[in-house]
Amino acid sequence: MVDHSAALFNKAQNYMPGGVNSPVRAFGAVGGVPRFIKKASGPYLIDVDEKKYIDYVGSWGPMILGHAHPAVIQAAQEAVQNGLSFGAPCENEIKLAALIGEFMPSIEKVRMVNSGTEATMSALRLARGVTGRSKIIKFEGCYHGHADCLLVNAGSGALTFGMPSSPGVPLGTVQDTLTATFNDLDSVAALFEKYSKDIAAIIVEPIAGNMNLIPAAPDFLTGLRELCNQYGSLLIFDEVITGFRVAKGGAQSLYNIRPDLTALGKIIGGGMPVGAYGGRREIMNQLSPEGPVYQAGTLSGNPVAMAAGLATLKELTAENFYSNLKEKTERLVMGILSRAKAAKIPLTANFSCGIFGLIFTSEGRVTRYAQAVNGNVEHFRSFFHKMLDNGVYLAPSAFESGFISAAHTNKEVDKTLDIIENIFSVSETYLRISV
């Protein structure tokens, strides 16, 4: 029963568009009643109807330590006692900035903001200001927040000017946004051949987390770095999702690629609203007040958020933190795949440390956006609701990644696998294929 959630959802729709403050939370992609959460602890969510869920959303990525981690809660509580916001510098800004740079050597200086969207938007403004160029390249299926210039859908043509994918975004705003095909270096090279003197930057997720989960091919990222070097453009890694999750040094450390700028978010706030962007010293020095490129924020560097973020990042230095997290992720994903194969369910998966994507398809490994969107969304909807009914909370969209935290143990993973095995064993015939 979800009586209280249903009542709250009905009430919320009177006061908020769609009843939510971020569209995916409304369950529009899967149908049904969104769960209103009243408490979270470790790997669990508890909704207002007192139902407990094993959580594989993790607030969409920030909760790498699990919910209500004692060290993070203590740090935030202590900070609150000294005031909620100063509008002036505080020492923890310096400490967090230094730790970010220690973890990610490509970030020689960093600017704190309030969200991943602010981080990518500001990084692009800085890239345009530094290069004196206006055009940017992004990739079909990659999501970099809701800034106007990044809300672009290129349709079937890779080598086209962007078209707005939301009303309210002026055509002129996105005409300088070029869209290429993820993991297709030729599509990027063709854009440089045509607009070589106009391209300020490439922005890319090294592991794309919003077309389910698709890792970049190593030679693809190497090629992007070489093209930027050749044409004098900047390479921006959007590591809002992957930063400090897939490795302490982010995805850039796994690929051994040094971007010019990096956008961060999610984990660096420990659950508080924080974003950041940083990179080469000479580029960051072009930001106001040192340089001419303007960016500011009333709540940037908020003392409570800085304390929570600093406490979170300190926990990531624990011995074997990432090897343990990767092992749990692999245990979960390989367990899901083996059960799908045994039940003849058409399912494939991609995963990295602490993050995974499941796609209902018989095509094999998914490496491009076009494959991801061809996954069977109806199969996912059925799977999602069966998991939810059995106490497992997945992202309510077939195109969103799942997250696992340090608080998940083999107990939660194995219980999840038992639930999946049971779901697959009794699934409708339409879910099955011949293998």
UniProtKB/Swiss-Prot annotation:
Give the keywords, sorted: Cytoplasm, Isomerase, Porphyrin biosynthesis, Pyridoxal phosphate
Catalytic activity field? (S)-4-amino-5-oxopentanoate = 5-aminolevulinate
Pathway listed for it is: Porphyrin-containing compound metabolism; protoporphyrin-IX biosynthesis; 5-aminolevulinate from L-glutamyl-tRNA(Glu): step 2/2
Q: Which GO terms describe its cellular component?
A: cytoplasm
Q: List residues, modification N6-(pyridoxal phosphate)lysine.
A: K266
From which domain of life does this come?
Bacteria
Record family assignment: Belongs to the class-III pyridoxal-phosphate-dependent aminotransferase family. HemL subfamily.
Q: What is this protein called?
A: Glutamate-1-semialdehyde 2,1-aminomutase
The organism encoding this protein is: Coxiella burnetii (strain CbuG_Q212) (Coxiella burnetii (strain Q212))
